[in-house]
């Protein structure tokens, strides 16, 4: 299995090879990583044997200059599996992937306060532990809010006269993510409904697989023209169901409400203008994304005149699954240009 993963990662964009289908399985993806200890109260990575929780981490190459790939909802780090197959190899582009608490191969406690803030805490704990000195932030879906939280914290620390903390940031790449509180367009029967489920009902979400694959909200992840297969749906289900984790669909579905509650603090216009002269930004979206399709239009309307780079790709919300090669090409091109600062 390790040889298979090495071959796939090594092919990359330059290799021009189509990876074998088994490289895109949840089992292969998680076999290529590790579970490390995490103490949320102290916001620190700790020895695994003493850890209250264990989180999934996958590294490709030297972490000192790694690109930080932050996961989307609901597929977690596994969502990057196809994209990785088309990215430059680990030497040309070191990479760091992770699952937040509750996602993928990380532990999934039922009595945990899931939020944007605790996700940012985890990212900030991982960076120094791995010796990350410089990074490009690549965020998909709700990790856009984690990026906004991380950048806002640095501004707040600076205002208090404290060190910004964390690695130097080379650039910020956000795709199909929420940026503006008035731009969320999630259909009512998806996250808005899920977040209102009582705790007792959350454990039955997504079960059995036969019900999961017929759930309207799940089908909405892909464009109407994309013929998602049972095999793809089963791999998604497998990644989400690890460690009895399907309840996370409802437990973490409050991220939009979280965003709206902190709308002023996580205002993308202010954050972008504060950093635009320090490193480049790219905001992208899919043509048929039903969840965040207004975000790109609002970004262009509000920040296009200030130099924000905006890109679109065809397809539905799960660009990582539906258009992995095109998304990988955008990411690789952006990372190559991160040494060029906006004028």
Model-derived features with residue positions:
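Flexible "cap/lid" subdomain of the alpha/beta-hydrolase fold that forms the substrate-access gate
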Residues: 2-44, 55-59, 78-79, 96, ...
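Glycine-centered tight beta-turn/hairpin loop motif at sheet-sheet or coil-to-beta transitions
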Residues: 48-54
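Conserved HGGG/HGGXW glycine-rich cap/lid loop of the alpha/beta-hydrolase fold
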Residues: 56-105
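Short hydrophobic "strand-cap" motifs at the C-terminus of beta-strands
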Residues: 70, 284, 315-316
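Conserved acidic functional residues
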Residues: 72, 141, 321
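Short, well-ordered alpha-helices that flank and scaffold nucleotide-derived cofactor binding pockets
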Residues: 82-89, 152-156, 298, 329, ...
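Solvent-exposed amphipathic alpha-helical surface segments
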Residues: 90, 130, 157, 334-342
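Catalytic active-site module of serine/aspartate enzymes centered on a nucleophile-bearing elbow/loop
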Residues: 304-343
